[in-house]
Amino acid sequence: MLRHRMRWARVALALCAVLLPTLGHAKKKPLPTVRWMAGAPGCSFERGDDGRYRWTMSDKDLDITLLVDSQELTKSRRRFYHVLGVYLTVTYKGQGKFEFPADLRMDFVRHHDVQEAYEDPTELQTRLQNDVDTKIFVTERQIKKNPETAEGKTSLLRRYQKEAAEFIEFLSTQYLEPATLNPGSPEAHGWVFFGTSNKWIGPWKEPEDFLLNVFMKDKVWQFPFSLPPTPGDLILRKPPE
């Protein structure tokens, strides 16, 4: 009888070990969301003469501005790995401190609503540097086989190296980073890129619809936007002075 009870006790313990993680996961609730809406309190939209759109959302402690180039869809296809870029500014207005995690995710609404996390800048730099090294090796091997192509291939390689070096430098200096914000240092800002190599993300559509999710500790700030914002929308860029 005692042996029978011990066997059932072991079974019960095993079931608890299986069920407890599941129950713990089930209790985790999704974060509440606040969404940008045209005309809503704390929400604004601006077309700048610099050729960029700005969506701003505010509450009592934070101002968050999303900036997107009006030609970003075209520019993304000319960028390394065709990454999509946005610029975010977060300004803290409180008197204490605020931990900004710089955790952004993009929903590609018209592409099966695929969600992509932001590209890690260090991983992106490493990937590009590896591709540069590979291109150097391949080019040198091609020139060795066909010396008459040396001038043309060397020129292309140097251009590729220059563009790659500039992009790596950009990633290391201009990317959005986590920050502790306070009255003495109230602002975090920088570029963020999202991959578009997912098999569900095809050629850009007209218009393209996106949903940027900015994750904070207590809630998610959502910026739905389209490129262009309205059909046929065109910004006349102010020429540089």
Question: Predicted regions span which residues?
Answer:
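Sec/Tat signal peptide C-region and signal peptidase I cleavage site
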Residues: 22-26
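Bacterial N-terminal signal peptides that target proteins for export
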Residues: 2-12
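Bacterial N-terminal signal peptides
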Residues: 12-20
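Helix-centric, low-specificity signal for extended rod-like, repetitive segments
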Residues: 1-3, 20-21, 120
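Conserved functional micro-motifs across diverse proteins
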Residues: 27-241
